[in-house]
């Protein structure tokens, strides 16, 4: 029996795939748990349409990420922080501070979770921070931490 998986099913496939399973397995396990539905002509057509829409959205998201990566190339963000002796900061500079500085200085809105900062910055200087804009696209943001 051909079924369309509504969720990932270990050993069978991922969400949206059409798989061939035993009729008893489908009726007694997959259907009651909402893991799959029978693959009728109407549902197959709807699945094809849904996959086309998802592919278009994914392509658009990737194009936007590439454009954002191009905008971030060559950008140096200056983050000002209070300092003590020897260039040590009072507190630290984290990804939230960097995202806010990007927004205020360059009008680039970037979610703080996309900035991959291993640990908060605690000294003055130039740093390179990776930004994961898309699963396939990563950009580098140069950050200059300066004293106030």
UniProtKB/Swiss-Prot annotation:
Keywords: Ribonucleoprotein, Ribosomal protein, RNA-binding, rRNA-binding
SUPFAM superfamilies attached to this UniProt entry: L9 N-domain-like, Ribosomal protein L9 C-domain
Gene3D superfamilies noted in UniProt: Ribosomal protein L9, C-terminal domain, Ribosomal protein L9, N-terminal domain
Molecular function in Gene Ontology: rRNA binding; structural constituent of ribosome
Cited InterPro entries: Ribosomal_bL9, Ribosomal_bL9/RNase_H1_N, Ribosomal_bL9_bac/chp, Ribosomal_bL9_C, Ribosomal_bL9_C_sf, Ribosomal_bL9_N, Ribosomal_bL9_N_sf
GO biological process: translation
PROSITE patterns per the UniProt record, alphabetical: RIBOSOMAL_L9
Purpose of the protein: Binds to the 23S rRNA.
Family of this protein: Belongs to the bacterial ribosomal protein bL9 family.
Protein name, entry field: Large ribosomal subunit protein bL9
UniProt organism field: Pelotomaculum thermopropionicum (strain DSM 13744 / JCM 10971 / SI)
The encoding gene: rplI
């Amino acid at each position: 029996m051909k079924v369309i998986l509504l969720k990932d099913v270990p050993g069978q496939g991922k969400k949206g795939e059409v798989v061939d399973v035993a009729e008893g397995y489908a009726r007694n396990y997959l259907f009651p748990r909402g893991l799959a539905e029978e693959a009728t002509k109407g549902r197959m057509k709807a699945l094809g349409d849904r996959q086309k829409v998802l592919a278009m959205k994914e392509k658009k998201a990737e194009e936007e990420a590439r454009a954002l990566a191009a905008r971030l190339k060559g950008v140096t963000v200056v983050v000002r922080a209070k300092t003590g002796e020897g260039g040590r900061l009072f507190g630290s500079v984290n990804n939230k501070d960097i995202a806010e500085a990007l927004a205020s200085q360059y009008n680039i809105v970037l979610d703080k979770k996309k900035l991959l900062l291993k640990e908060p910055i605690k000294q003055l200087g130039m740093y390179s921070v990776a930004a994961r804009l898309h699963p396939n696209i990563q950009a580098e943001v140069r950050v200059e931490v300066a004293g106030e």
